[in-house]
Structure formats: structure tokens, C-alpha cells
């Protein structure tokens, strides 16, 4: 899974952006749960998800 380009994130509508933020937060929660129970098979996904969430939140903040 490649990290998303910031240009792709900036082209999202406000509704899509909010949906993607909620999705990334849910995925991060699931990854934390898997890590705590030692079921996480791909630890790099944790970093990718945090990075994607940071991009989404940055773009949301830029629009305010």
C-alpha cells in the first residue's frame, strides 16, 4: 500500500474528507487493538495509517 499523495487528498470534497478521516481513525483503532493482542501481521500499516490520518487532518485544518 503506497502512501497517498497530498494532491489526491486536497481534491476530495468536504464530505469525502470527513468520511476518510473517520475511516482512518477506525482503522487506527483496529490496528492498535491487533497490536495489543499480538495479532498484527503487518506493523508497517500502523505507520501508514497514522501518516494518512495526519494528511487528512492537515487538509481539513487548511480549509478552516
From Swiss-Prot:
Which keywords does this Swiss-Prot/TrEMBL entry list?
Ribonucleoprotein, Ribosomal protein
Q: Which SUPFAM superfamilies match?
A: Ribosomal protein L29 (L29p) (SSF46561)
State the source organism's domain of life.
Bacteria
Question: What Gene Ontology terms describe what this protein does at the molecular function level?
Answer: structural constituent of ribosome
Extract the InterPro entries matched here. Answer: Ribosomal_protein_uL29, Ribosomal_uL29, Ribosomal_uL29_CS, Ribosomal_uL29_sf
> Which is one Pfam family of this protein?
Ribosomal_L29
- Keyword field contains Ribosomal protein: yes
Name any Gene Ontology BP term: translation
Give the similarity note: Belongs to the universal ribosomal protein uL29 family.
Q: Which NCBIfam families match?
A: L29
Which PANTHER family did the record assign? 60S RIBOSOMAL PROTEIN L35/50S RIBOSOMAL PROTEIN L29 (PTHR10916), LARGE RIBOSOMAL SUBUNIT PROTEIN UL29C (PTHR10916:SF0)
Query: What name goes with this protein?
Result: Large ribosomal subunit protein uL29
